[in-house]
Amino acid sequence: MKKCTRCLLPETVPGADIDAAGVCAFCRRPETSSAANAAATANRADLEATLRAARNTPGAAYDCVVPLSGGKDSLYLLHRLQADYGLRVLAFTCDIDLPPVAWSNIRRALRKLDIDHVVLRPAHGFLTRLFRYLLCNQEERGAVYTVSYVYAPIFEGAAIRLAIEKNIPLVLAGYSPGQPEPERMLYEFAPALISGEDWTPPHLAECGQFSAADLAHFYSPLQLPAGTRFPRYLAPYHAWDYDQAEVIRKVTELGLVQRSHHAN
């Protein structure tokens, strides 16, 4: 898949129109480029201030939750947050049939960095029903989009729940620029989305094929008591300079993966 060489926007985004030089239509607009540069500067400043303020959060055993998939970006994020910012990191993995190489990377990195880890394994029966329904009721963009747009809110919401439960102020995701789709997130999930919206996909709630227990896998702040303290959900790579080759080199050099080809 082609991505814009400036902002890493995927070609699949409507209106991307990546030209022969590898630049998307949005970056070719001077006013858009200027606004994007201003936003990037603001995001970098916000991220630096936020990470430094989160260190040794009073009343919490951890300063941040990091969703950990076993891929290079989440592995390197663990290292940077711990080594560069001194944060107490809690790694979190939602295990939906992760491949063996991902688990190998996870175990290796956690041992190397000495980081605590929480794993959630949703019930097999629920996942079977969920994926069967999604594959039989695909949206126009196909199976990958159909599944990922439901799977992602499960693990994102679970990470938010974990942060709330443990009074952790930040969830920091290893999304690289262009991930997830910009329509879902650019640097930060909107605070109103975390504190005021039910994340249950309406078509799942309305189809009659899922029980209340099934739907409870999706995060909903509407069920939480008044006064709940909600975390911020940020994507640091959206603010930092990002170089995929450098990330692969670093995780290999640090021994977070066994070989560079494991850093997918």
What is the predicted role of each segment?
Residues 1-64, 80-264:
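Nucleotide-activated chemistry modules centered on ATP-dependent adenylation/adenylyltransferase
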Residues 64-73:
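Short, glycine-rich nucleotide/cofactor-binding loops
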Residues 76-77:
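Hydrophobic positions on the alpha1 helix immediately C-terminal to the Walker A/P-loop
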